[in-house]
Structure formats: C-alpha cells, structure tokens
C-alpha cells in the first residue's frame, strides 16, 4: 500500500488527552513528510488555534494544507489563504438561533475571526471556549456580541455551535426536528459541543477534495480519527484508521484500529503503513 496523503484529526487522535503533542507523533509525521507524503491536520478549530501545532510539527511550508472547521475550510498553512470554503448565510443563522431558543440551548456563530454571541437563554450560557475566556493570551478568535434582529448583511458563517454540558446536549438532540437534519449537517464534535454545518461539509469530503486536486487515488489516502465528526475521515479513506479510544461507530468503519491517542497511536499507524518499520 503506497500512502501519499495522511489526514489526521487532532483532539483524541494526534493529541494526548491533556492536549499535548508527543515527540513520537512529531517524529513519525516529519519522517512521512520527508518521504514525500502530504500530511494534513483536520480539526473543528480555526487555523489560528492550531498554528502552534503546525509550527511544532513542521507543517507550515509552501504546499502544506489544513482542514479546519470540520471540513468547512481548506487553507494553506503558510499564508492562511483559503483554498475552499463552505458557509452558512444570515437566514440559516437565524433559523438555527430559533432552534436553540426552542431547545433552551445557547448558540454561537463562528467565522474566520470571531465568535459571535447572540443573546443566550436565561441560565444557559455558552461554555464554548470558556477556558480561553479566562486566559486572554489563549484567545484565537474574538468574542463579539451580536443582535440577532440586526445581523449584518451579508453575514456568512463557517459553523454554528451549541455548547453546554454533555448531559444537556444529549437530552435535547433527540428533540431536533428532522427538517433541520435534512438541511444541515449536525453532530457532536466533543462531549460538550454540538456543531451545525452546511449539509455537504465534513472532514471526509474535504479530504477527498484535496486528494483529487493532488491526483491521488483513494487507496493512497489514510485517514485517522476517533469521534463522530471523524466518521467520514475514516470511512472514505482508502485506509481508515480508528484510535483504540475511538467511539464504536468509528471503529466499525475502520480498516485498522491503532493504539490509543495516549499511546501514540498516530505514530504507530504511520510507522506500520507508511514508513514500514
């Protein structure tokens, strides 16, 4: 198997549970890149929030790409230039805000620079990026209050999130009308984050787009992940790799189950299938 492209999720996959990056994973990725393999980090985060990882690994050269906002954006890591972008419009944002109000869940609109904060339901403030609010040195996007009745026109958003403790989200998700699932791509990216994206947006479609643009066949692509938002990343790769800590649904579609994120499962898979050592 001649792997030419590796697409790697971050949280729960490349990163340890304490969100650190191991020397083993860094070394494996660097060796793969030196061997001519295109390595792409895939995340729900904005590019600004992963620059330190790209720098540490060495993925900021000309030609390096990243999949951000769970597939809504493909960007050049060296310049931030947008290669492909899928967005939600003003009317769709209002529609999702009304859903949040009905479910008593807070809504945040997120673009390349801002986390917009329309009014939250009483007693249900958003916990999205709450840790970064406490430490302003870690804020990658700027929080900005917005009046839902006076949104700018045009108003294009990369993704919408509803962020509350997991048990609150789990209680409300079954109450989302089917019409919303038909119109949007809705899933939990983390225990406390529900994401709402354009219907055609996911990590797998972004991975496919890059593979086709670079002239790679499906069997030359490896995708690694652990959560619901990684399902297409794993299922649509020629070699789909699930972490040992992955949810059952991801393991079911995987071709191989590697070690856990805390055991450097990414390095293990790259060494086994790409570097052949």
Where are these regions (language model features)?
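Active-site phosphate-binding/coordination module
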Residues: 23-129
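Conserved acidic, metal-coordinating active-site core of Asp-based
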Residues: 99, 103-224
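Residue-level signal for inorganic ion chemistry
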Residues: 32, 43, 70, 160, ...
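Short active-site oxyanion
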Residues: 36-40, 62-64, 159, 219-220, ...
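Short, acidic loop-to-helix structural element flanking the phosphoryl-transfer center
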Residues: 19-36, 85-92, 145, 198-212, ...
